[in-house]
């Protein structure tokens, strides 16, 4: 049985709820309840109200989602990405 395709969206956290859940408003205005993914929970990534996040949603239930990445303001791509001419 194949795994269904997940919908990836971006939004901002509007409210921190109990039990590691968050109310997220997507860029298109839709609101949903989201929880942190496994590695984010394992490494204690803190998410606060106002943070920009990427999340995955199932096409079968668009009211719930899983936060997969927290975007930091003012941070560009990391040092290992992009084209650089260093280390020759």
Swiss-Prot record:
Coiled coil: none annotated. GO terms for molecular function: ribosome binding; rRNA binding; translation initiation factor activity. The keyword Cytoplasm applies. One of its GO terms (cellular component) is cytosol. Pfam families: eIF-1a (PF01176). Gene3D superfamilies: Nucleic acid-binding proteins (2.40.50.140). Keywords: Cytoplasm, Initiation factor, Protein biosynthesis, RNA-binding, rRNA-binding. Residues 1-72 form the S1-like domain. InterPro entries: NA-bd_OB-fold (IPR012340), RNA-binding_domain_S1_IF1 (IPR006196), TIF_IF1 (IPR004368). SUPFAM superfamilies: Nucleic acid-binding proteins. One of the essential components for the initiation of protein synthesis. Stabilizes the binding of IF-2 and IF-3 on the 30S subunit to which N-formylmethionyl-tRNA(fMet) subsequently binds. Helps modulate mRNA selection, yielding the 30S pre-initiation complex (PIC). Upon addition of the 50S ribosomal subunit IF-1, IF-2 and IF-3 are released leaving the mature 70S translation initiation complex. Component of the 30S ribosomal translation pre-initiation complex which assembles on the 30S ribosome in the order IF-2 and IF-3, IF-1 and N-formylmethionyl-tRNA(fMet); mRNA recruitment can occur at any time during PIC assembly. This is Translation initiation factor IF-1 2. It comes from Acidovorax sp. (strain JS42). The gene is infA2.
